[in-house]
A protein has these predicted regions:
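C-terminal subregions of glycosyltransferases and related glycan-biosynthesis enzymes
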Residues: 221-324
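Nucleotide-sugar donor-binding/catalytic module of glycosyltransferases
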Residues: 1-241, 247-250
Length: 324
């Protein structure tokens, strides 16, 4: 028997392209939520596998699911934007079709916003990594995630909590739909890492921000290496990655949030740059090194101007990258 849905208060947008191997678990994590009052818009973005059929089956058995189909792939940004236009609930969140919500995620996120009156709440997340059994095991909360979400803070501004700027993923948050429409926020289309600039726009335009330390999402690292974040050795992927970080910093700059800029520059140099330098050192294409070197030089100049303290390892890698 199909469940009788409660009046929904939050819409979860679930884009997916060729995620048939993971979609059932993602959708089951929605149905296992302690909060019943949700609906989900499932966007099949031109899949060539059984993703569309799985989405359709879910919608046929549970009226809380609605399916939107793109006959040809348009990308995550376009998929999310198309679904955003259909949202009728007060709150909206996101879940990628290969990730997993923790059982109490929606209740905690929506209850926090209801209690505080803030525009957006960000929670913690962990990597879901392949294990020796052929399955996946969740990891620990990483330091930059803890810095953004611990301890719980309600009704703060970006100026009061600049480290929240390090939480740049779409799917660890719930926000008021009114915030998106008031500020005219849309995801960039035709680009990878499209959520980074959107996160900074949400933070800079929110009237108040909440953060909670609860792990709300398990973010999958696919065993077959097919997710976008596992292809940073591609020059094209690197280009979009660097541009997304530049664009996010530009949003913070334009809004006058110097402390958040400092926090973001430090985090990128400490966390994002070292693995990219390691890739560049063995990469066969000089274009990769030149692009990364130019980006690191920009951030190094900014770090020096802002007197941002960096650890010794980061300084060493920065020096190597600038020489490219």
């Amino acid at each position: 028997m199909s469940p009788t849905p409660a009046e929904p208060i939050v819409t979860v947008i679930v884009p997916g392209r060729d995620v048939a191997a993971y979609a059932a678990e993602a959708l089951a994590s929605l149905q296992a939520q302690s909060l019943d009052a949700w609906r989900a818009i499932l966007v099949d973005d031109g899949s060539t596998d059984a993703t569309g059929a799985l989405f359709a089956q879910a919608a046929a058995s549970d009226p809380r699911f609605t399916v939107l189909t793109h006959p040809t792939p348009r990308g995550l940004g376009a998929a999310r934007n198309a679904a955003l236009d259909l949202v009728e609930t007060p709150f909206v969140g996101f879940l990628d079709g290969d990730d997993v919500l923790t059982p109490d995620a929606l209740r905690r996120l929506t209850a926090t916003l209801t209690r505080s009156g803030s525009d957006i709440v960000a929670g913690a997340y962990v990597r879901l990594r392949p294990d020796e059994t052929g399955g996946y095991t969740p990891g620990i909360v990483q330091p930059w995630v803890r810095a953004a979400t611990e301890p719980e803070r309600l009704g703060v501004s970006l100026a009061e909590h600049p480290d929240v700027s390090g939480n740049i993923v779409a799917w660890s948050k719930v926000s008021r739909v009114e915030l998106w429409r008031r500020a005219g926020i849309r995801f960039p289309e035709g680009k990878l890492y499209e959520d980074q600039v959107v996160a900074q726009r949400l933070y800079t335009t929110a009237r108040a921000i909440d953060v909670i330390p609860d792990v709300v999402v398990h973010w999958r690292e696919r065993a077959d290496g097919s997710s976008i974040t596992q292809h940073k050795d591609s020059v094209a992927v690197l280009s979009d990655y660097l541009e997304s970080m530049r664009a996010g910093i530009a949003v913070l700059d334009a809004a006058g949030h110097r402390a958040a800029v400092r926090a973001r520059v430090r985090l990128i140099l400490d966390m994002d740059v070292p693995p990219l330098v390691a890739i560049a050192q063995r990469h066969p294409d000089d274009a990769y090194r030149r692009a990364l070197g130019a980006f690191v030089a920009e951030l190094a100049t900014r770090a020096d101007a802002e007197d941002i303290a960096l650890d010794d390892a980061t300084v060493s890698l920065r020096s190597a990258a600038v020489l490219w």
